[in-house]
A protein has these predicted regions:
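Short loop/turn and low-complexity linker motifs enriched in small/turn-promoting residues
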Residues: 1-128, 156
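Short, aromatic- and glycine-rich surface loops/edge beta-strands on solvent-exposed regions
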Residues: 60-64, 231-234, 400
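Blade-loop segments of beta-propeller domains
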Residues: 93-103, 134-154, 160-162, 170-183
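Repeated scaffold domains used in trafficking and secretory/extracellular systems
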Residues: 101-107, 141-149, 181-192, 216-228, ...
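Hydrophobic beta-strand positions that form the internal "hydrophobic ladder"
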Residues: 114-115, 155, 194, 230-231, ...
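Surface-exposed loop/turn elements that mediate protein-protein interactions on large endomembrane-trafficking
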Residues: 120-139, 159-180, 197-217, 235-258, ...
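Ankyrin-repeat and related helical/solenoid repeat scaffolds used for protein-protein interactions
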Residues: 350-397
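Blade-level signature of beta-propeller repeat domains, shared across WD40, Kelch, NHL, RCC1
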Residues: 386-415
Length: 415
C-alpha cells in the first residue's frame, strides 16, 4: 500500500491516500519548512520543490532565505492532489532606494519618462538618460493639480482653478487651452485630438488650433473612447457616436440608470464598465448584453489593471476581478469578484508589479502584497512611511516613489 501512495493516518486510525505540495519560488536557494520542519531547498538551477506522501490535512508552509521576508501560509493537502504555491517571490528585508531628486512636491509618469515638480515650482523631465528642466518657476502655471499624458504630443496640465494648458516638452513652453474651463471633464485622446465633455455635450478640438467641434446632437451622461470610437451613456442607452451628421448606433441598455446619479463609462482591458456615483460598479456581460452589479462601495472606487486582472479598491477594501479563468487554486471563475483584503487603515494607492503581486500604500506606508488569498495574505513592508505617490515601470521593473518630498527609485524588485 505504501508503494501505491497510501499511509496510515493515526488520527483517523486508517490508511488514506496521500497528497503533496509543489512550490516554486524566487530567488534561488530558498528553504522550505513544513510545520516548522526543514524539508529541502531550491538551487540556482532548480527553483521548484515537490513534496509527496503527505497525509491529507492542513500544513503550515514556510519559505525563507536570509535577508528576505519569509512567505508563510496554512494550506490544505488533499488526497491524490498536489497543492500548488508556484508564484512565490521573497522580497528583501532592506531594499536600496536611489535618490533621483530632493524637495519634490509631485511627479507624473508615462512609460519611460516622468515629469516632476519641485518645491520651487520648477518642472523637470526625468528619463533614463538624465534630468532636463522643462519650465522655470515663472513659466509653470500656478496651482498644478494634475499632468496627463494623453499621447506623446498631447500633455495636459490642469490647475486647481480650472485652467488647462498644453505642455510642449520639446519647445519647453505651455499654451492655454481657452476652450477648457472648470466645467470641462472627461478629456480623452483620439488621433491626437482631444475629445471632452462640457455641459453634457461632447466636443473635439485640435489643441494646437483650440477650435471646438460639437460631436453629440443630444446630451450625454458620460462617454469614453475605445479604438477611436466614442461610446456614450445617455440615460438608459449605450450608444456609439460618430459626429453631428451621422446617425448614432444603439449598442446596449442600462436598466439601472437613475436621473439623480452621476456616471462614468470606462473600458478596462477591453471590458466595458459603468461606475455609478464613484461607488457602484456595473459590468457588461457580453453573453446576454446586460450590465451586472459587481461592487457596491461606501467610498470612492478606484481601479488598476494588469492584462486579464483588475484590482478595484476603495479606502479600506481591495477586490480582484479576473477576466478569464486561470488554472490557479485561489482564483474563481472569470468575471467573479474576489475579496482580497479589508483593512482598518486607509488604502491610498495601488500599482501592479506583475500578475501575482502589487505594491500599495497603507496610511502612506509602502507595502507589497500577493493576491493569493488562501489563508492570510503575505504583505511585506518596504520601510517607507511617508509615501504619497508610486509608479512601477513594467518595462524596466523599477519602482519610483515620492517619500517625504524625496523622489526615489528602488533596485529591481521582481524577476
Amino acid at each position: 500500500m505504501y508503494s501505491q501512495g497510501y499511509r496510515f493516518d493515526i488520527k483517523k486510525f486508517q490508511f488514506v491516500e496521500t497528497g503533496g505540495i509543489y512550490i516554486k519560488a524566487f530567488p534561488e536557494e530558498v528553504h522550505l519548512y513544513i510545520d516548522d520542519e526543514y524539508i529541502n531547498k531550491t538551487s540556482f538551477f532548480t527553483r521548484d520543490i515537490l513534496v509527496q506522501n503527505l497525509l491529507p490535512e492542513n500544513y503550515n508552509i514556510r519559505i525563507e532565505k536570509d535577508g528576505y521576508h519569509f512567505w508563510k501560509k496554512n494550506l490544505e493537502i488533499e488526497s491524490k492532489k498536489a497543492t500548488e504555491a508556484k508564484y512565490i517571490i521573497l522580497f528583501k528585508e532592506n531594499n536600496n532606494f536611489d535618490s533621483i531628486e530632493n524637495n519634490i512636491s509631485a511627479f507624473y509618469p508615462n512609460d519611460n519618462q516622468i515629469i516632476f515638480l519641485n518645491n520651487l515650482n520648477e518642472l523637470f523631465l526625468y528619463r533614463s538618460s538624465g534630468i532636463n528642466k522643462i519650465l522655470n518657476s515663472t513659466q509653470v502655471p500656478d496651482n498644478i493639480e494634475n499632468i496627463s499624458f494623453l499621447s506623446n504630443e498631447n500633455i495636459i496640465v490642469k490647475t486647481s482653478t480650472g485652467l488647462y494648458y498644453l505642455l510642449d516638452i520639446e519647445n519647453k513652453k505651455t499654451k492655454l487651452i481657452r476652450s477648457f474651463n472648470i466645467n470641462t471633464k472627461n478629456i480623452n485622446n483620439r488621433n491626437n485630438k482631444l475629445v471632452y465633455q462640457f455641459n453634457n455635450s461632447i466636443y473635439e478640438i485640435d489643441p494646437k488650433e483650440d477650435s471646438p467641434k460639437l460631436l453629440s446632437r443630444d446630451k450625454v451622461n458620460a462617454f469614453t473612447v475605445e479604438n477611436n470610437s466614442i461610446i456614450a451613456l445617455r440615460k438608459r442607452n449605450i450608444v456609439r457616436i460618430y459626429d453631428i451628421i451621422r446617425e448614432e448606433e444603439l449598442l446596449y441598455s442600462f436598466e439601472n440608470y437613475n436621473d439623480n446619479y452621476d456616471y462614468q463609462i470606462v473600458f478596462i482591458e477591453k471590458e466595458l464598465f459603468i461606475i455609478e456615483n464613484n461607488k457602484n460598479l456595473y459590468f457588461l456581460n457580453r453573453e446576454n448584453n446586460t450590465f451586472e452589479n459587481k461592487i457596491n462601495s461606501q467610498e470612492e472606487l478606484k481601479y488598476t489593471s494588469f492584462f486579464n486582472e483588475i484590482l478595484f479598491y476603495d479606502n479600506h477594501n481591495i477586490w480582484l476581478m479576473p477576466l478569464k479563468r486561470y488554472e490557479s487554486p485561489f482564483f474563481k471563475d472569470a468575471y467573479s469578484i474576489i475579496n482580497i483584503k479589508t483593512f482598518d487603515r486607509k488604502v491610498d494607492d495601488i500599482k501592479w508589479l506583475n500578475g501575482d503581486y502589487f505594491v500599495f500604500t497603507l496610511d502612506n506606508e509602502l507595502h507589497i502584497s500577493e493576491i493569493d488569498n488562501r489563508d492570510k495574505l503575505n504583505i511585506f513592508s518596504l520601510n517607507k512611511n511617508d509615501t504619497s505617490n508610486i509608479f512601477f515601470n513594467g518595462n524596466t521593473k523599477d519602482l519610483y516613489i515620492l517619500d517625504d518630498n524625496n523622489f526615489l527609485k528602488t533596485e529591481k524588485l521582481i524577476p
